[in-house]
Amino acid sequence: MVREEVAVSTRTLQWKCVESRTDSNRLYYGRFVLSPLMKGQADTIGIAMRKALLGEIEGTCITRAKSEKVPHEYSTIVGIEESVHEILMNLKEIVLKSNLYGTRDASICVRGPKYVTAQDIISPPSVEIVDTTQHIASLTEPINLCIELQIERDRGYRMKAPNNYQDGSYPIDAVSMPVRNANHSIHSYGSGNEKQEILFLEIWTNGSLTPKEALHEASRNLIDLFIPFLHAEEQDIHLNLEDNQNRFTVSPFTLHDRLGNIRKNKKEIALKCIFIDQSELPTRTYNCLKRSNIHTLLDLLNNSQEDLMRIEHFRIEDIKQILDILQKHFGIDLPKNKRF
């Protein structure tokens, strides 16, 4: 029998941004390419990435509003052009940016006549308003308007519960989706066994993060989903045949469990899979690193202590915390100076 030789590409898989633009404060666009891929791989990656972009990325939004002396959602207030329902819909559209966890309170307290915009929202320091010009209400008379707001960080779309509140508190449909849309297309080239594909990925965001940031976060979320399948040992899988023959649970895969992978082959790949937000770093330190495009442990180890001290707002205490974590969990030291 004659064995047919199969040609396999030895080129490194690469991606790059081929187009990036800001259409408005609340509409960013980015176009990316990934190549070379084997036949069928582009569709596999494109479908998974689109789902992750639209459903796995967290966003921040207003989820509840409260104002006294409002009988019901569809009532009107003398001196305000919009109905209560219209004001709630305007609040729903406000684009926020934050790294908060849990619930935060905000408020609006103004006096008319006034054109009320997102700029009038008094929010916590951890919450940033992306477009301060977004319209909320128009006060046509000298009246006071005070609204208490609840802000949450979540993912996807959450329908508000039926409103049975009598205290002027109204839930708002939570749309925690920073990515407005995502499309992928495929270009094939070559022939026979050498046929390859290029994946084109288009991303539109609401301005709370860039398309590149969205692509990075979606990729990270996909990696986190698949890591348990890569590393879970047979003894870590607990079958519960008594309750349900088709159900099994996998032990949580913690940061500590990944340490063995670093000392194995493919060390660089393992380092790429460990993101700095999975460590014990304080929020301020994490945000400083993220702003400097340091997202993974590999990114961090490509810098020296001297490099980190050049980061804006970085302190010597932050360096010590990073060194302690690297030594404690990984047995790795960060050089003081860049080695050439």
From Swiss-Prot:
Its EC number is 2.7.7.6. The keyword Plastid applies. Keywords: Chloroplast, DNA-directed RNA polymerase, Nucleotidyltransferase, Plastid, Transcription, Transferase. The gene is rpoA. This is DNA-directed RNA polymerase subunit alpha. DNA-dependent RNA polymerase catalyzes the transcription of DNA into RNA using the four ribonucleoside triphosphates as substrates. The lineage of its organism: Eukaryota, Viridiplantae, Streptophyta, Embryophyta, Tracheophyta. One of its GO terms (molecular function) is protein dimerization activity. It is an enzyme of class 2 (transferase). InterPro entries: DNA-dir_RNA_pol_insert, DNA-dir_RNA_pol_RpoA/D/Rpb3, DNA-dir_RpoA, RBP11-like, RNAP_asu_C, RNApol_insert_sf. Residues 266-340 are annotated as: Alpha C-terminal domain (alpha-CTD). Belongs to the RNA polymerase alpha chain family.
